[in-house]
Amino acid sequence: MDRLNQLSGQLKPNAKQSILQKNPDDVVIVAAYRTAIGKGFKGSFRSVRSEFILTEFLKEFIKKTNIDPSLIEDVAIGNVLNQAAGATEHRGACLAAGIPYTAAFIAVNRFCSSGLMAISDIANKIKTGEIECGLAGGAESMSTNYRDPRVAPRIDPHLADDAQMEKCLIPMGITNENVANQFNISRERQDEFAAKSYNKAAKAVAAGAFKSEILPIRSIIRNSDGTEKEIIVDTDEGPREGVTAESLGKLRPAFDGTTTAGNASQVSDGAAAVLLMKRSLAEAKGYPIIGKYVLCSTAGVPPEIMGVGPAYAIPEVLKRTGLTVDDIDVFEINEAFAAQCLYSAEQVNVPEEKLNINGGAIALGHPLGETGARQYATIIPLLKPGQIGLTSMCIGSGMGSASILVRE
């Protein structure tokens, strides 16, 4: 009997082998694309709102993938700054783009993970048999919403002085200062990390590395005299050449500390989406399968140091899948701030050469609700067939999320 048990154990696939297996019920990725990311307030999307960006993007997404829109049974779009997370206008954007009204819609807001939560929502619906095909993504216009006073939380006066409530209201930049102070992450290390992000992104742009993931879309620039100009947006506006730790070191801190405009993510506009299907449906319809969604995990952390979220979410998703850091070939950890990303990556022992290979949000920008989906569009081209990728981000009010996918 012991010998039989031993042989049985040898025949069972390990966690990595199991994840790489292909099954008819798998949630597969048929396509993942994004817009170029526009600079907030002065970039190519500054005159249009998120629903315009999303409509134009989805039109191009449908055209590029040649998907039959009638197959789409549900759409989940992440957004942070619109009222009600864009529930009305983003549903309208889907219809305007050619997705039929028969496709249901849900607006998702879990701060910076909203795009990933949209992917998780659609993937879980496919896993449970609710649907067989869905579209997940995110859209954000920080140019039009970032300074809107209506976005600020309004707290009941009876809770305004509650200590726990106050922690959830701490500005994100201050939480990053808390991380830097608590874990002794110097200004110099933050600037070095940020400079590497800029340099990697600049090289990627020069090499055309992002062209396969970006769908050029139409935008409109409104001039001061009221005239309008139509343009095509096809290149990220955040990356720039020649950034060094020394040049970043000359920037003044945004707060009383070490966080600057140079070592924090950029205010940005953009959209991204991932088309997910049940494997058996994708194969039956002849759609290409470029990846497989595996799992997403979210972990809570102290709100006052919310940036450490990936340091908790990544071990959680690895534990639930039985994988190790060594099993992961590429990591995309959102660079909300240099200090928090640097801390999280080091806590999990992420090899530097596997982290944000083409730069991250410090150089590219961070349209809040879009980032989680953007990471999928970015990481898939970086993976070879059979390799495993991991995406992660911190989340305002004290959380972190991480997900695992396989390239096929």
Swiss-Prot record:
Catalytic site positions: C112, H366, C394
InterPro entries, per database record: Thiolase, Thiolase-like, Thiolase-like_sf_Thiolase, Thiolase_acyl_enz_int_AS, Thiolase_AS, Thiolase_C, Thiolase_CS, Thiolase_N
Domain of life: Eukaryota
Chief localization: other
E.C. numbers: 2.3.1.16
CDD domains, per database record: thiolase
Catalysed reactions listed for this entry: an acyl-CoA + acetyl-CoA = a 3-oxoacyl-CoA + CoA
Metabolic or biological pathway: Lipid metabolism; fatty acid metabolism
Any one annotated GO CC term: peroxisome
Subcellular location, record wording: Peroxisome
GO annotation, biological process: fatty acid beta-oxidation; phenylacetate catabolic process
Keyword annotations of the record: Acyltransferase, Fatty acid metabolism, Lipid metabolism, Peroxisome, Transferase, Transit peptide
Enzyme class name: transferase
Gene Ontology MF: a single term: acetyl-CoA C-acyltransferase activity
NCBIfam families: AcCoA-C-Actrans
Family classification: Belongs to the thiolase-like superfamily. Thiolase family.
Oligomeric and partner information: Homodimer.
Protein name according to UniProt: 3-ketoacyl-CoA thiolase A, peroxisomal
Provenance organism: Candida tropicalis (Yeast)
